[in-house]
Amino acid sequence: MQLFHFHTPEQVPPAGIPACAVAIDVLRATTTIAAALAAGAEAVEVFADLQSLQAASRSWPASKRLLAGERGGKTVTGFDLGNSPREYTPERVRDQRIFMSTTNGTRTLQRLERIPVVITAALVNLGAVVEFLRRGAFAEVWLVGSGWEGAFALEDTACAGAVLHRLGCSWEQLGNDEAVAALALYQTWQDNLLGLLRRSSHGQRLLAISPENDSDLAYCAKLDRLSVVPQQVQPGVLALAG
């Protein structure tokens, strides 16, 4: 297995398709997608823009859909849910189709949707993702961070490094310098992941919006909180991996 890390979807090569791609947005889209599916949501359908989301949601029964939206770390006005994983309780989301659009993570998923196998990873479902990759024995895997509006995000690269560390990758399996750096970053911070999230620019951004968002950072920093792997089952639609 050869593994490559790309800090943002904009860095993904325009040519070449790997066997598997892993989308990462620790703060908070891929954490929240895992939380939604673990809580019993029927599926999460992702959109880069709000207009497409609203148009698609109208074809779904009103009693079986929830609109989830975030821009700049804040819930979209008029939507049912934001991007806090703590909102996605079984009482709220069980058997619901979640129509979701976020600032960064949903854009990453749309960039990767042509790849044969697409899953999402976060720190909270690290172990489940690593086991999925081991079972799949994919020849080439891309670990793609979402970043923040096209820029590097510390927490996404740390999560990519966590995947590489847990897989026990040899140096020969690390396909680019970004993968080497991701592994080194995670190994430096592995005993203080909450501290890393608090120090990250997006963590600081969320805390500036509300100190209560520190509870989200704590949620997102906890390894192996969830044992689910969200997998793309059709373009833009994620459900539990079989």
Swiss-Prot record:
Family statement drawn from the similarity comment of this UniProt entry: Belongs to the ComB family.
Keywords linked to the UniProt accession: Hydrolase, Magnesium
Protein name per the record: Probable 2-phosphosulfolactate phosphatase
HAMAP family: ComB
Gene3D superfamilies: ComB-like
Organism: Synechococcus sp. (strain JA-3-3Ab) (Cyanobacteria bacterium Yellowstone A-Prime)
Reaction catalysis annotation: (2R)-O-phospho-3-sulfolactate + H2O = (2R)-3-sulfolactate + phosphate
Cofactor(s) the protein requires to work: Mg(2+)
Documented EC number(s): 3.1.3.71
Molecular-function GO terms, alphabetical: 2-phosphosulfolactate phosphatase activity; magnesium ion binding; sulfopyruvate decarboxylase activity
Top-level taxonomic group: Bacteria
Record-linked NCBIfam families: PRK00886.1-5
